[in-house]
């Protein structure tokens, strides 16, 4: 077995890169699913694109539950392995996967049930509602597959097998890219399914990803084995899984909540603003992914070094991550300022929407650079096991500051107020994040 002391011995930058790159790639692939779907769905009609934008937050929520709970399972497995407690790691894996499947079943039923009334709250256009129901009905029935796939991803990550997760994700993503145009437009022998085809293509991609994981689990020996004997519910273990998982789920689910509230504010003015917000969120995932990948790489490193009492290294790691995410955000800002309209036109062919969207992007990107502070501080706190402090930062960013700001500015300036609320929120949150992080890390707690 490889010893984990490399976390405090290897030079900072190569170490951070080796941990972060696989994470960045896997997250990019995950968001590619959504981008590819949008690209082809935009070719159907503007209504189809609006339907996709309205369903997106709910889809995002399902992913948040899967990934957030996976983070909990991952942490408990990694800690068990680190302490040499194989049985605990095996139990965490088995019960984590069983609970994930259960989450999938509950979410499938709940989301399909709420969808008609959910869509009706945001639009009165029956074509949009019809398409939204078609898409979500198929997309949500793959929830169990998504949950299981993400549990296996976190299982392989916890034992350091990043290459397997890459292969599985790529297989699913490539299948989705190939199947999307075939099932949406139906060339040759393929059925023309329209927006349902997009949902089906994504589902088939997810099935393929899970299949690769199951095959890899059979073929490659990994230190964690799933055994039936480990399925006996273990109360304290399950509580531990949720203690790490629930704050992580909330961190990931808050943006969904925000998008839905903002959709409500914007739909008063026109449907095209809802589409612009949907497009912005798709572009934004691309920008924030490399940054949050670096931060994901930081998590285990900062926790390990903090535990080992290496406070100097904790500070170096934090600063290196802050610089790296700052550089990424600066590049993102430049791209948005230079190519706002071309980026928008990838997802809509309405000239008015492209113009308004370009203007929106240029306003919003003012907050990118400073947001590196909150992204880094939040990740560092999670790595130190301070989930609740990290949640405070996310709450500022996605609810406490931005909702009142968007509401007031929208009253004062119309839809542009919503775009200004974004950068104002980033500035305020960065200040709060820095303060929370300094207060938490200044006094190393005696263990």
Give names to the regions the model predicted.
Residues 61-64, 108, 176-180, 210-214, ...:
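Hydrophobic transmembrane alpha-helices of multi-pass small-molecule transporters
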Residues 28, 32-50, 119-126, 182-193, ...:
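Helix-terminus/linker motif at the lipid-water interface of multi-pass membrane proteins
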Residues 18-37, 138, 172, 205-209, ...:
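Transmembrane helical elements of multi-pass membrane transporters/channels
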Residues 40-60, 126-131, 195-197, 237-244, ...:
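Interfacial/gating helices of multi-pass transporter permease domains
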């Amino acid at each position: 077995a490889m010893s984990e002391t490399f976390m405090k011995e290897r030079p900072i930058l190569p170490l951070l890169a080796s941990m972060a790159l696989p994470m960045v790639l896997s997250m990019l692939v995950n968001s590619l699913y959504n981008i590819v779907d949008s690209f082809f769905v935009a070719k159907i009609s503007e209504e189809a694109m609006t339907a996709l934008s309205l369903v997106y937050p709910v889809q995002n929520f399902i992913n948040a539950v899967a990934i957030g709970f996976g983070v909990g399972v991952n942490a408990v497995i990694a800690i068990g392995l680190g302490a040499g407690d194989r049985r605990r790691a095996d139990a965490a894996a088995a019960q984590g996967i069983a609970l994930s499947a259960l989450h999938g079943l509950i979410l499938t039923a709940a989301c399909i049930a709420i969808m008609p009334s959910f869509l009706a709250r945001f639009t009165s256009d029956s074509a949009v509602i019809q398409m939204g129901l078609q898409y979500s009905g198929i997309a949500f029935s793959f929830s169990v597959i998504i949950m299981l796939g993400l549990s296996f991803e976190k299982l392989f990550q916890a034992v350091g097998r990043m290459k397997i997760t890459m292969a599985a994700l790529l297989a699913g993503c490539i299948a989705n890219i190939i199947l999307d145009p075939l099932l949406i437009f139906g060339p040759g022998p393929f059925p023309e399914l329209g927006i349902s085809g997009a949902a089906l293509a994504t589902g088939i991609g997810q099935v393929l990803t899970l299949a690769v994981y199951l095959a890899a689990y059979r073929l490659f020996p990994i230190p964690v084995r799933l055994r039936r004997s480990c399925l006996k519910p273990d109360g304290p273990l399950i509580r531990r899984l949720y203690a790490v998982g629930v704050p992580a789920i909330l961190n990931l689910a808050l943006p969904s909540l925000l998008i839905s509230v903002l959709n409500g504010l914007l739909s008063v003015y026109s449907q095209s603003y809802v589409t612009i917000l949907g497009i912005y969120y798709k572009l934004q995932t691309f920008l924030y992914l490399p940054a949050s990948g670096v931060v994901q790489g930081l998590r285990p490193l900062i926790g390990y070094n903090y535990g080992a009492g290496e406070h100097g290294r904790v500070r170096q790691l934090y600063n290196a991550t802050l610089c790296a995410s700052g550089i990424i955000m600066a590049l993102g800002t430049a791209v948005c300022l230079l190519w706002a309209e071309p980026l928008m036109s990838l997802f809509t062919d309405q000239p008015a929407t492209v113009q308004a969207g370009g203007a929106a992007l240029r306003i919003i990107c003012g907050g990118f650079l400073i947001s590196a502070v909150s992204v880094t501080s939040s990740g560092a706190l999670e790595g130190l096991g301070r989930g609740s402090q990290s949640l405070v930062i996310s709450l500022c960013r996605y609810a406490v500051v931005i909702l009142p700001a968007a509401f007031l500015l929208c009253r004062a300036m119309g839809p542009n107020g919503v775009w200004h609320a974004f950068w104002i929120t980033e500035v305020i949150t960065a200040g709060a994040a820095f303060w929370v992080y300094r207060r938490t890390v200044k006094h190393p707690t005696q263990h």
